[in-house]
C-alpha cells in the first residue's frame, strides 16, 4: 500500500502531498541483509594502511650479539628477533584491502528495507526546500527542522544544486547531508529521521522505479 506524505514549506505551510511507492517505502526489512550490507560498507571505508616491520624489515641486527656457547645465556642470532626491544613484530598487521564484494541487488534491497522501516514509523518527511530563497540561513533551517522532528540524528537528502540548503545545515550537530544518489543503508539506519526535499525524493523514486512521482495539491 502506497504511503502519502505532506510536503511542507519552510514557513510550516503544507504545500501538497507526494506518494511514496510501496515497492520502495513499504518493503520488508531484512535485518540480516541490512547487517551484511552495513558491515561491508563500513569495512570498505577502512584505509587498511596499517603496517608493521618483521625481523626482516627492521634495520640492524646483522651481527650475532654474543658467542653461541659458554655464556650461560640462551643462544641468540640477532638483536632484531621479536623477543628483543626494537626487534621485529610477529604476525603484525600489513596493508590490506578490507572491502567486500556485495551484489548491487542486495545493496538496493537493504536500502529499501531501511527506508521502509523509517516510513512505517512516520520518520520520513518531505519538504519543498530547507530555506526560502538563495540565501543560506542556519538559524532558519534549524528552526524548520525542529518543526519536523525533535530527534537528534537527522539525515537530510537534497539535490546537488541546492547549495543554499547545504550551507544552511552543514554545521548543525546531528545533521548529515546526502544527495539522492548517495543514499545508503548505513546513513538511513543511523538517522532517527530522514528529510527529503521534493526534488531529491522524486529523483530517488525515478532512479529506482523509472516513474517520477508528482506532487499533488
UniProtKB/Swiss-Prot annotation:
Gene3D superfamilies: 3.40.1370.10. Residues 42-100 are annotated as: Disordered. Keywords: Ribonucleoprotein, Ribosomal protein, RNA-binding, rRNA-binding. InterPro entries: Ribosomal_uL4, Ribosomal_uL4-like, Ribosomal_uL4_dom_sf. Disulfide bonds: none annotated. The keyword Cell membrane does not apply. One of its GO terms (cellular component) is ribonucleoprotein complex. SUPFAM superfamilies: Ribosomal protein L4. GO terms for molecular function: rRNA binding; structural constituent of ribosome. Pfam families: Ribosomal_L4. GO terms for biological process: translation. One of the primary rRNA binding proteins, this protein initially binds near the 5'-end of the 23S rRNA. It is important during the early stages of 50S assembly. It makes multiple contacts with different domains of the 23S rRNA in the assembled 50S subunit and ribosome. Forms part of the polypeptide exit tunnel. Belongs to the universal ribosomal protein uL4 family. Part of the 50S ribosomal subunit. PANTHER family: 50S RIBOSOMAL PROTEIN L4 (PTHR10746), LARGE RIBOSOMAL SUBUNIT PROTEIN UL4M (PTHR10746:SF6). This is Large ribosomal subunit protein uL4. It comes from Mycobacterium avium (strain 104).
Amino acid at each position: 500500500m502506497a504511503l502519502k506524505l505532506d510536503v511542507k514549506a519552510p514557513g510550516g505551510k503544507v504545500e501538497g502531498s507526494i506518494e511514496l511507492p510501496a515497492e520502495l517505502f513499504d518493503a520488508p526489512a531484512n535485518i540480516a541483509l541490512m547487517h551484511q550490507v552495513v558491515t561491508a560498507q563500513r569495512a570498505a571505508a577502512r584505509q587498511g594502511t596499517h603496517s608493521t616491520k618483521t625481523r626482516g624489515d627492521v634495520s640492524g641486527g646483522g651481527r650475532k650479539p654474543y658467542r653461541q656457547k659458554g655464556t650461560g645465556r640462551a643462544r641468540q642470532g640477532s638483536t632484531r628477533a621479536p623477543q628483543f626491544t626494537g626487534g621485529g613484530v610477529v604476525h603484525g598487521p600489513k596493508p590490506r584491502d578490507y572491502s567486500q564484494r556485495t551484489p548491487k541487488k542486495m545493496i538496493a534491497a537493504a536500502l529499501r528495507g531501511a527506508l521502509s522501516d523509517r516510513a512505517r514509523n512516520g520518520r520520513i518527511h518531505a519538504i519543498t526546500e530547507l530555506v526560502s530563497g538563495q540565501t543560506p540561513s542556519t538559524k532558519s533551517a534549524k528552526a524548520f527542522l525542529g518543526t519536523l522532528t525533535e530527534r537528534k540524528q537527522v539525515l537530510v537528502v537534497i539535490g546537488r544544486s541546492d547549495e543554499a540548503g547545504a550551507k544552511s545545515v552543514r554545521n548543525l550537530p546531528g545533521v548529515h547531508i546526502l544527495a539522492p544518489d548517495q543514499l545508503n543503508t548505513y546513513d538511513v539506519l543511523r538517522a532517527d529521521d530522514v528529510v527529503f526535499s521534493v526534488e531529491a525524493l522524486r529523483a530517488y523514486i525515478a532512479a529506482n522505479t523509472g516513474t517520477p512521482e508528482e506532487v499533488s495539491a
